[in-house]
Amino acid sequence: MRKKVRKAVIPAAGLGTRFLPATKAQPKEMLPIVDKPAIQYIVEEAAESGIEDILIITGRNKRSIEDHFDRSAELEFNLREKGKTETLKEMQQIADLANIHYIRQKEPLGLGHAVLCAEHFIGDEPFAVLLGDDIMVSETPALRQLMDVYDVYGTEVVGVQSVLPEDVSKYGIINTSGSQGHVYEVNDLVEKPSPEEAPSEIAVMGRYVLNSSIFSVLKTIGRGAGNEIQLTDALREVCRKEPIHARLLEGNRYDIGDKLGCFKASTEIGLMRPEMRSQLLAYLEDVIKRETKEMLR
């Protein structure tokens, strides 16, 4: 009987240099998107997908991530004393999202190495990997979409979306022989190809379901691009021996790995909040009018 996906890994050891100076003294994963730190959206997606245990791969100066997902007796006492029961309940729910564990990636040797750090936590079970630079908003959680495919095929599954031809060099791109509905069979993966070399315009979007056999592959592939251990290289090795599937993700994806993407995510997620929507729309309309008037001068 095929094992269910119960565990997830969230790599969060990066330095966040694109967001300096904001990340000089705090992790980029803790930067707010409206009123939640970015990593909370990722943890919530995992929990809503049915994940029970989450391992966050951290590094130096990441202690605030652990504090965020822990209980805070002082804060809870303060909220209780002030009668802020709804806020108190919300804070307590953060600590109860899942069983969250932590381990440090002692060297910045790439995504594949970060995944390899989770080997003892995962054991011989299938598991999910969620990258913190991609926030997905969808009716069915993005990870759940992948897990449903895994339940059918039992193979590695990657989450994908179509991108513009000029953007293929930013992503891992799949080579596929065809699809059944939203599911592709993957023949190969190419990491950040030029538009001329790209086998398709279907890009990997930071969500994976992997079998534990990936660990032995990661140990043998050696270092790839950037002198780092690349997860894409390991998946290419798997492709040569057995099928891999890709799930075309339904929903909106927000790339918060750069400043503009982070701003877009905050704006659009803010528009989804009923208490903010009308005022935010009015503000954006006013900005557009002012900027348009300025441009026409």
Curated annotation (Swiss-Prot):
Assembly: Homodimer.
GO MF terms, alphabetically ordered: UTP:glucose-1-phosphate uridylyltransferase activity
Disulphide bridges: none
One Pfam family here: NTP_transferase
Coiled coil: none
Functional note: Catalyzes the formation of UDP-glucose from glucose-1-phosphate and UTP. This is an intermediate step in the biosynthesis of diglucosyl-diacylglycerol (Glc2-DAG), i.e. the predominant glycolipid found in B.subtilis membrane, which is also used as a membrane anchor for lipoteichoic acid (LTA). YngB contributes to wall teichoic acid (WTA) glucosylation and glycolipid formation under anaerobic fermentative growth conditions. Might also enter other glycosylation pathways, leading to the decorating of other cell envelope components with glucose residues under anaerobic or other growth conditions.
Record pathway: Glycolipid metabolism; diglucosyl-diacylglycerol biosynthesis
Induction: Expressed under anaerobic conditions.
Protein name: UTP--glucose-1-phosphate uridylyltransferase YngB
InterPro entries, sorted: GalU_uridylyltTrfase_bac/arc (IPR005771), NTP_transferase_dom (IPR005835), Nucleotide-diphossugar_trans (IPR029044)
Enzyme nomenclature, EC number: 2.7.7.9
